[in-house]
């Protein structure tokens, strides 16, 4: 019979393997297929979509994404603003052609490599201090540029394999691709598709990893329900602190591995109470699973097993929960007022073009089916930057989530299940969302707060000057191209 430490080790491995397959699919969705080709023998016909699609992730030798390994790190834990997860990238090498320069079976070889951010420039580094969210977007964009390189041999020849590269996964740049991955899973698991064909499609390995993780979580909940409950509580405790305080959580874990809390002096007690808070320290010391792992000298699995929460944040989007977006009552007061004034000046400038014929009988001039297309400047401004009217959520979204509930009931249960969904008319104020999980008590509340906060950041991004500059750049590029014809 396996011990608690063995069970946590198995779950930790499942979490990393699931994340690796998910990040491969995410990068595959993001990169252009032309720059990241697959051979013709990896094309599979999907009878549901009625078209051919790319096959299994691991089946292509000329796939740049498969030249690296991806590992989720401790930087993914805690409140991370709009960051889904943080991961480390290591370039693979061919063992038969590269002399072995480290002892065989060295467990921590990659961890001993020097760390390097993804292609950071001096300007980007300076901007990190003032722009808390911009660094994640820069990292992720530079990672995509590196994977788009045609000559991977050049990457290894330039000694890029000697570093640990790391990058954040920003919600703004990735949530649409994660939603597409969820659609692919549902399409490729349709009962009308033969099992042999479904096993050759693009999400096959991700479904294998999700199945193993689901089975091990379900087995733990049945065989050791007390430990399972303590594990869920441990996820809440470890991830309830801000990201910058995770280093103090690690110090506390290392300290309690060799000493009891009661044996520490009052100065250390006071220091951890001040930094981490009374609630965290008391909950940490009273958790049954944490106590077992500390006493069995397996304290590393407190961190590794807690990485399930950032994985749940990504699966929360894949499984369709993020589509249950609440009504935004106020995106950003200052930015909204500025954009409102800018639009007002724009419409005033072309006021004559918006004047239409007036009549007591409006239906005399307009068809009923076209009424939704008739709006003035006030309506346009309200539609873009004002308070939206609550609309009923498509029933297909609920059915979509329930399909995942049939496939992975334990994982869906951790996200809140499929029996009760948030009200369709719920409203949130983006300026009032706390930047922490402090007042929350269960994992589904953590996930909803992260989703609401990240969605608000996404709305701010698409209305920001940064997006305006990006669009101007694309317009200028298109103009130069058209002028060259």
UniProtKB/Swiss-Prot annotation:
Main location: virion
Highest taxon above the source species: Viruses
Compartments where located: Virion
GO CC annotation terms, alphabetical: virion component
Keywords in alphabetical order: Virion
Record protein name field: Uncharacterized protein R347
Organism in which the protein naturally occurs: Acanthamoeba polyphaga mimivirus (APMV)
